[in-house]
């Protein structure tokens, strides 16, 4: 658990969390407690409903990602969709946007496709952030 302060200080889109991505190849969760109201221009959480479910297409994407990752040591650890405006808009149209009042608690399986929404310059979003990421290879006794 940690206090998370996200501050947008310029208009450059250098925040990789704003690209749709899967955190891991297995189920994990993250949660946020909004300390302040979060509007559309405050960087709300976006989530593609049911994207955490395993499908044949998803398995192929994970396999391709793992092969690319094995040959490129500078490759990002999580699978990220390109940040083209066309891809973002298409996904934004179907994403659930968590625009909520303060004291709202949001929990998501981050094996699903998600991102941080865009925010205006000089915007601050304060949350209490929780996450759980177990080792998928641990031996169960």
Q: Could you describe each region identified by the protein language model?
A:
Residues 1-53:
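Conserved double-stranded beta-helix
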Residues 35, 112, 132-134:
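Short beta-strand segments enriched in hydrophobic/aromatic residues
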Residues 41-109, 113:
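Double-stranded beta-helix
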């Amino acid at each position: 658990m940690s206090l998370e302060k996200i501050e947008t200080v310029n208009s450059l889109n250098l925040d990789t969390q704003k690209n749709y991505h899967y955190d891991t190849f297995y189920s994990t969760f993250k949660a946020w407690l909004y300390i302040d109201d979060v509007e559309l221009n405050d960087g709300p959480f976006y989530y593609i409903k049911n994207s955490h479910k395993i499908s044949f297409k998803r398995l192929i994407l994970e396999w391709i990602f793992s092969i690319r990752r094995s040959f490129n040591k500078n490759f990002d650890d999580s699978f990220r969709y390109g940040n083209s405006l066309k891809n973002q808009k298409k996904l934004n149209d179907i994403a659930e946007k968590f625009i909520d009042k303060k004291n709202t608690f949001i929990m998501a399986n981050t094996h699903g496709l998600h991102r941080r929404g865009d925010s205006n310059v000089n915007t601050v979003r304060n949350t209490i952030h929780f996450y759980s990421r177990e080792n998928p290879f641990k031996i169960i006794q």
